[in-house]
Design a protein with these regions (language model features):
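Zinc-dependent deaminase catalytic domain
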Residues: 1-136
Length: 136
């Protein structure tokens, strides 16, 4: 979890820094990611980190880690993802589809006025897909 928190510091988003680390069953790092602008796009434009533009330009840490693994030909089947913020519904779908079998993250605030609905849906999907959730 410490590595996920450290990775989150690479994000240029001043309001939300999220890091993700994917490991195999022996805790070997398979991939890492943080929330940020897609590779090749200009990440020095400040407005891209402000609402509402950030929702259009920013990729989440979990998907960045999954995409990096795919780009490098790394299989994620039966792996574990450590995240310093619980995943949204979009990232939960990516986690399930990539074959990750365990999510380790802080407990989500399911009453959050914006993200609560995402957290609830993420938990529901992860449980249905038999992805283990471990709260830290």
């Amino acid at each position: 979890m410490e590595m996920a928190s450290n990775t989150s510091e690479w994000s240029k988003d001043k309001n939300r820094k999220v890091g993700a680390v994917i490991v195999d069953s022996d805790n070997n790092v398979l991939s890492i990611g943080y929330n940020g602008i897609p590779r090749g796009c200009n990440d020095d434009i400040a407005s891209r980190y402000e609402r509402p533009d950030k929702y259009l330009f920013t990729e989440h840490a979990e998907r960045n880690a999954i995409f990096a693994a795919a780009r490098n030909g790394v299989k994620l089947k039966d792996s574990i993802i450590y995240i310093n913020l619980f995943c949204c519904a979009d990232c939960a779908r990516a986690i399930i589809q990539s074959g990750i079998k365990k999510v380790v993250a802080p407990s989500p605030d399911i009453e959050h006025p914006i993200w609560g609905v995402h957290f609830k849906a993420a938990i529901e999907m992860l449980e249905e897909a038999k992805v283990e959730i471990k709260y830290m």
